[in-house]
Amino acid sequence: GDMLVDVDASPEVASSVSGEGSAAIIANTTVQAILAVNALLDAGTPVGLILEGEYAGDYVVSSDSLADVANRFVIEATKTDAVPPAKIIKSGVKVYVPGALPEYSSDETGREYGVKNYRNLLNNSLAWDRFALEKQMGFALAASADEADIIVGNGALSEDEAAKVAQGKPYVGYGSVAVSSIRDAGLEVDCSLDDGDKPTKSGDFDALANVKFESDSIVTVAYAKRGDSLFYGHGGAMMTKAPDAAARLLSITNDPFVEGFMTADHVEKYKGSLQAIDCTFEGWNAVLFANSLTNKAYQLHEYRYLAAAIYSRILEGDFAL
């Protein structure tokens, strides 16, 4: 028979809301949940990040505040009268993305020339971060590190920005450039792109692999509790040094990759490698990932790692209805 069917309309999708009660648990399963949380925070509605138990890594709000976001976004929510332990996510937070180039080029005398911000039109990695954070996840961006609550991105930190992070400014960095900036700021961490004695252009490598969850963490629990170990990273980098006090979050398993663009030598080094750490000690307040989280703005599967890392740095008091 004819197996082809005419498609003349997009499928209808809607939120799933079950249960009864004064509180609503928003499952942290998609980017739509992040958008819903940020929309609620923008409206001044209290949102809690659940820290433990069955709903760890999910979000809690009052049931009265759920209807608007359930209609605007496609989310999964469960109503209940039992409010799980949660911390309030700070509202009004601004995120600064580092890595912008100067507005103009300059010659050896310091004289500026060129078209204003032309080079940043070609600054793809900066654009991916900004687009992913603002447009795809709903975070508000800041024009400078000074006016931001947190610094987030794959770009190199300036000397002043790195000093702020070293002094405790919240930071989420990903990729070898970002990790190297923190190393240069004084954190005992290193990120390698080389195949040992055979340096390569491994910054162009990527892999869709499986990860081992090395420790319990609010950054990773939404994936860990659902058995979602798939993890994409562009860059091919590996954390070859980490502070003893850092919490080890993710490492690549020895399983065959689902997809990989790497030399055979690099594959063997990449397997078992450390990919993410949480540095909350001695004044540091940072989460670091060895590889990309926003590459080409298509890594939506990894965005919940990024959002959870951001939220984990900006928690306030206990959530209560």
Annotate each language-model stretch with its function.
Residues 1-321:
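Intrinsic-disorder/low-complexity accessory segments
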